Amino acid sequence: MKSKIYSWLAIGGLFAALATDVHAKNVILFLGDGMGISTVTAARILAGQLKGMPGEEHALSFDQFEHVSLIKTYNTDAQVPDSAGTITAILSGEKTRMGVLGVSASVPRGDCASSLEHELPTILELAEEAGKATGIVSTARITHATPGGAYAHVPDRDWENSSTLPAEARALGCKDIALQLIELPHGDGPDVVLGGGRAQFMPSSAPDPEYPDKMGLRDDHRDLISEWLDNAKSRHYVWNAEQFQAVDASFTGQLLGLFEPSHMQFEADRSQDPGGEPSLAEMTKMALGRLSQNKEGFFLLVEAGRIDHGHHFGNAYRALTDTLALDAAVAAAVSATDPEQTLIVVTADHSHTLTISGYPTRGNPILGKVNQAASLVSQANSKYLPYTTLGYANGLGYKAVYPDLTDVDTTAPDYQQIAAVPLPMETHAGEDVAAFAAGKAAHGVKGVMEQDRLFHVMMQALINDPTKD
C-alpha cells in the first residue's frame, strides 16, 4: 500500500500546481453518523425551542457555512448504504461494498486474502506520511466503522478484536481493527484518539476499571493499551473524565482516551455515567489543542456516532440531542481555528428513516404531537387519534393497534416514535445527505456530489500546504 500512498501524495502535488490558492494547513471532518437532512432540520428546531424560540428560524453552527452540497451515499452493492462502505468512500476516495472497511469494491465481505491485496490508503495515513498531526474523536467505539475507517483495512467491519477474527483469517495474516490502530505503520500513528471501546483492546482475563463485572474481549491475551503505552515515550492513557480533565494543555505527546467498554453514553445520559465522560465538544477542544502544536498542520476526524444509534432504537430524543452535541463541537472548532488555514467539513455517512410530517403550527414542540391535525380531519372520522410530528418508516416503534397518545408525553427522553413497518431495528435510508464546508478550499463542496469526492476535496486542501517551506 506504500506505493499507493506516494501516488496520492503525487496527486496532491498536481492539485497544488493547478490551484495553489486552495490549500489548507489543517482539515477537520465532522461526521454525524446517520445525520440525514430530516435529522438536521429537527435538531435545528429543537435547539431553537430549547432557547425559547419557535425553533424553525434557528441556525445550527454549520447551517451558517457558505458552501453546501448534496452527497450521494450508495455503496457499490447497496442502494441504501452502511457506515463501513460510506466512510471508506469519504476517507479513501473510492466507493466500495457494504460491510468492508478500507478496501476496494473487488473484495467480497469476509475475504481476508483478497483484502490484503486491495487496501486503500486513508487520508489519515496520508497525513501521517506528510508529517502532519492526526487525531480521531468519536462517541462510538473507536474500532467502530467510522473511526475505524481512518486507519483500518478489513474485509469485515465486525472484526473489531481478536475474538471476532475467523481462524482462516488469522492464519492468512489479517489483523483485527483494534490491533491495526495500535500497530499503524504510518508516521508515529494518531496523536490523539478519544472515544469508546476499551474492551476491544483488553484481554478477556482483565476486568474493566469502571465496570468490574465486565471483562475485556481479546482472546489473544494481549493488552493493547499497555503495549501502546510501552511502544513510545510521551504517551498517556485516560479512561474517565477526571483523568481527561487533568491532561495538561501543553501536553505534546500522544493521547489515548477510551471512556467506555463499548460506545460512550448518549449525550442525554452522559451526566449519569459512573466514571464520568467528556462531551464531544470537550474532546474536540482537547484534540485541537494537541494537534495545533504541529507546525505542519493536522487532520482531525470527529464523529458523533450515537446519532445513528438513537435512530436505530427509534428514539428521536437521543438522536437529536446527540446532534446538538455535534453542533456544539463544530462551534468549538470554528472558534479555535483560523479559516484562512483550516478547512472544516460537516457531513453524514448516510441518512435514517426519520420523517417530519403533519401540519403542526409554527413553534409546536418538535418532539410533540401535531396540534393542528384535528382541523384537517373530517369530523366524521371517529378513528382520529393524536400523532407525533416525528416518526419512522420502520423499526421497533411499530404498533399493531395504533395507541391513543392523548396522555402520553412524547417529549420524554425514552419515548419511542411510532414506526410504519415492524422491524427489530430501524434502518438506514438512501436519500442524499448534506455536506457543509467552511474555510480554506471549502468551495470544492458544491452541487450534487458522489460521496468519494469529499476525499479529494480534503486531500486537495491538506497536502502540499503552500505555507510550508
Where are the model-predicted features located?
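Structural beta-sheet core signal
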Residues: 29-30, 136, 346
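Glycine-rich phosphate/pyrophosphate-binding loops
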Residues: 119, 124, 129-149
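Bacterial N-terminal signal peptides
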Residues: 9-17
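His/Cys-centered metal/cofactor-coordination and adjacent catalytic loops
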Residues: 102-117
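Substrate-binding/charge-relay-adjacent region of secreted/lumenal peptidase catalytic domains
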Residues: 97-100, 174
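Bacterial N-terminal signal peptides that target proteins for export
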Residues: 1-9
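Sec/Tat signal peptide C-region and signal peptidase I cleavage site
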Residues: 18-24
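A post-motif C-terminal structural segment
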Residues: 25-26, 35-88, 113, 143-469
